Amino acid sequence: MAHYHDDYGKNDEVEFVRTGYGKDMVKVLHIQRDGKYHSIKEVATSVQLTLRSKKDYLHGDNSDIIPTDTIKNTVHVLAKFKGIKSIETFAMNICEHFLSSFSHVTRAHVYVEEVPWKRFEKNGVKHVHAFIHTPTGTHFCDVEQVRNGPPIIHSGIKDLKVLKTTQSGFEGFIKDQFTTLPEVKDRCFATQVYCKWRYQNRDVDFEATWGAVRDIVLKKFAGPYDRGEYSPSVQKTLYDIQVLTLSQLPEIEDMEISLPNIHYFNIDMSKMGLINKEEVLLPLDNPYGKITGTVRRKLPSRL
């Protein structure tokens, strides 16, 4: 028969590993008006705080709790007074506020996603106040800071869906009694990029670096516009993106990438007396292959 403790505060058999509380998905649209020229940042922000005391968990004592509604209001007010130059800077502002304003907060963790609005543009002329939603990659960041420590800053790209109709293959893999997959020299390659990297310090043009990483991802996936670039595996493309990124962007310390292999299969039309030469394909959402990898700069040799 199971035995239960009535006094959880005196339970010596468990210990806290990590605690936190906060507010998720606090949405803000910030408008910067410079005369008739307007700029916008729409974000969704999630904040988690860790407190020095655990008395709220142990005894139901809420005297140290900053209400999550207050956290939401703080995000709104910081957007007003600090603006949102970049989502990374905004996340650091939020961390700094809670750590400097409340001595019993020991850790602040802030995640921000930016809605992908792009200014209307035609023939090189930019509209002064109109924007279009362009879901060609979501900019996100993750900033964590402990008391008396520097902010640990990650940025990333997600929901960047790309496809090429050739210059991809998959050959030379292990074949056993359960293998039915044929080798292919030419196939469609489609994926939805998730990419996350860590900065070495905070003195970075975050917007420019994010754009540079996105350009590298597209460059290594697609190759030259007139002929493309062959990919022998998703793994090779993933690694090539990482190596080029770290070689060109010294402010980045490490990079994680996840590339699902989204399948498009040739539809068999032989029963209808037709030959389908990879012209009509069937998209399959799942199951799908998933390839991941993280690289970092090597530490200098001590020899």
Swiss-Prot record:
Key words, A-Z: Acetylation, Oxidoreductase, Peroxisome, Phosphoprotein, Purine metabolism
This entry carries the following GO cellular component terms, namely: peroxisomal matrix; peroxisome
Where does the record place the modification N6-acetyllysine?
K10, K23, K27, K36, K118, K122, K164, K175, K185, K220, K277
Gene3D superfamilies found in the cross-reference section: Urate Oxidase
Active site per database record = K23 (charge relay system), T68 (charge relay system), H263 (charge relay system)
Q: Which residues carry this modification: Phosphotyrosine?
A: Y288
Reactions catalysed: urate + O2 + H2O = 5-hydroxyisourate + H2O2
Give the sites modified to N-acetylalanine.
Answer: A2
> One GO BP annotation here?
urate catabolic process
- Where on the chain is Phosphoserine found, per UniProt? S39, S63, S231
A Pfam family reported for this protein in Swiss-Prot or TrEMBL: Uricase
Function recorded in the entry: Catalyzes the oxidation of uric acid to 5-hydroxyisourate, which is further processed to form (S)-allantoin.
Q: What is this protein called?
A: Uricase
Q: Which organism is it from?
A: Rattus norvegicus
